[in-house]
Amino acid sequence: MRVTVNGSMGKMGATVVEFVNAKDDIELAGSIDMGDSLADSLASSPADVVVDFTRPEVRMETVRTILFGGAAAVVGTTGFTPDDLEEIRAWVKETGKGCFIAPNFIVGNVLMQQFAKKAAEYYDYAEIIEYHHENKVDFPSGTAVKTAELMCENNKTFN
């Protein structure tokens, strides 16, 4: 499998590059960061999958470039609205390429979200507190936003 990593100089992107390089059955097709062209990379070095850890403000342009560039997308970038997701579904249908969006790739955080969702059924008050390094790009984080959404799924309202 050929993989391009978009946002390869960030913490998560660099981790994915390191992982791909350590595997015998996965080839690094491209390593893209700010100033590089994802479209040019996909044209000159096609990939089966693009793993994206870029910035929320370019999320839709990036996903469109990946799908219409002939690759499936694994997206760790946050900030997608319901309308964005509907548009992405249309692109997936049109291109026949898959798109997986996850606001957090850490198993412990995914479990924490499920625990918070379940606990929300039993409480009338909840608070999400985050602590991040000083270079954190998105605040509140996609993880916090998704956790809050999950907690409110069963018609719960928290102020």
Label every model-predicted segment.
Residues 72, 87-106, 122-126:
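Rossmann-fold dehydrogenase core element
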Residues 1-18, 29, 120-159:
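Active-site-lining helix/loop region of Rossmann-like oxidoreductase modules
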Residues 34, 78-80, 104-106, 131-134:
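Short, ordered loop/turn segments at secondary-structure junctions
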Residues 6, 53-54, 76-77, 102, ...:
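Structural motif
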Residues 43, 49, 53-76, 85-87:
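Rossmann-fold NAD(P) dinucleotide-binding segment
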Residues 64, 77-99, 115-118:
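Rossmann-fold NAD(P)-binding glycine/threonine-rich loop
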Residues 19-40:
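NAD(P)-binding Rossmann-fold cofactor-contacting core
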